[in-house]
Amino acid sequence: MGWSCIIFFLVATATGVHSQVQLQQSGPEVVRPGVSVKISCKGSGYTFTDYAMHWVKQSHAKSLEWIGVISTYNGNTSYNQKFKGKATMTVDKSSSTVHMELARLTSEDSANLYCARYYGNYFDYWGQGTTLTVSS
């Protein structure tokens, strides 16, 4: 019986039975100018409230732009000045999910949007991205 437990532990460790960190974002959005959209990022495989969550924009014509950050512990936010009044971040601890609402959309808002977990002084895990297309 003892060897069975040891072997199971070794196999479980080697095959990654332990939870893996994942950031799962909501699907693509195609919306008309002037409306708002709310996208989400669900964390799993770690203690959700131990890490702040950032949002980053990658438009077709520009490099990465930092939108802002939300504390998953208390909901405090900080935004890039450019996105104040445009982006609103919220957290739902019960579902380990952060949301970002973007208001008064224009074609300039079309982009790939990424959530990223902050660890120490770098982003250690990224969501797969949510494509936002604003078109009439």
From Swiss-Prot:
User: Which InterPro entries has this protein been placed in?
Assistant: Ig-like_dom, Ig-like_dom_sf, Ig-like_fold, Ig_sub, Ig_V-set, IgHV
| Gene Ontology MF: a single term | antigen binding
Highest taxon listed in the record's lineage: Eukaryota
Enumerate the UniProt keywords alphabetically: Adaptive immunity, Immunity, Immunoglobulin, Signal
Kindly give the SMART domains that the UniProt entry links to this protein.
Answer: IG (SM00409), IGv (SM00406)
Q: Which CDD domains match?
A: IgV_H (cd04981)
Q: SUPFAM superfamilies attached here?
A: Immunoglobulin
Which Pfam families does its entry note?
V-set
Instruction: Domain (Ig-like): give its ranges.
Output: 20-135
Protein's name in the database: Ig heavy chain V region BCL1
Species this chain originates from: Mus musculus (Mouse)
